[in-house]
Amino acid sequence: LQKMRAWPDAPKTACPSPAAYMKQFLDDGDNYIVTLSGRLSGSYNAAVQAKTIYQDEGGKGNVHVFNSRSASSGQVQVALLIRELADSGLPFGQVVEQVETFIDRMKTLFVLETLDNLRKNGRLTKVQSLVTGALRVKLLMGATREGEIEKLSQGLSIRQTLARMVSRMAEDADHAGRRLVIAHCNCPERAEHVLEMVRQRCQFGEVQIVPTSGIATVYANDGGIVTAY
């Protein structure tokens, strides 16, 4: 994180190659791949290529690639649901169908301390990033149904914007009883603060806190909070 802050250019990331995915496939089992939003990373396309090559070469295992249309906490949500459904004994096709339906309904909300890495990698307009940095405005962002980033609101401080994020959850009639995953980038205390607000205002059936990792850490950057339900 310190090296990324000090480096003036975009942090370089690379998605797994199709061959790297294929090395993990099981010929005698079900293979589920969950990727970062296809609008943010080449991981989804690489995984789809891996599936195609594997099947063309006569691979016998079942393979499905899930485009989470989210990041970090959203990927965790999808992975948890896959495990729950598979462990319950559902056949491969039904697991895929139910998880794809869940992804269609999943909501992703996030607040970042800085937008620099998103800007440097072309995920935000340069003007938007420079303006928010100059004004010290913190944006409440979300994911569209296609997995693209959109601005939802803003605040003058990160605590104010996090509070607005929780308010948005509380006002969503569909959130009650669902699982919320809170992912944090090097800020566990901030995640706990969000959890406390959620407990006071929302009716989630379950809440989990997880750290970001991999490419999600690059985009969330130090202090970022990414939620999905």
Q: What do these predicted ranges mean?
A:
Residues 1-20:
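N-terminal glycine-rich anion-binding loop in soluble enzyme alpha/beta folds
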Residues 4, 29-33, 55-66, 209:
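Glycine/charged-rich beta-loop-alpha catalytic/anionic-binding loops adjacent to active sites
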Residues 4-7, 28, 102, 106:
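Alpha-helix boundary/capping residues
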Residues 7, 24-32, 206, 229:
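Generic structural signal for short, solvent-exposed loop/turn connectors between secondary structure elements
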Residues 17-47, 54:
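N-terminal glycine-rich phosphate/adenylate-binding segment common to multiple enzyme folds
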Residues 40-43, 47-52, 62-64, 70-229:
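Mixed-charge interfacial surface used for oligomerization/domain docking
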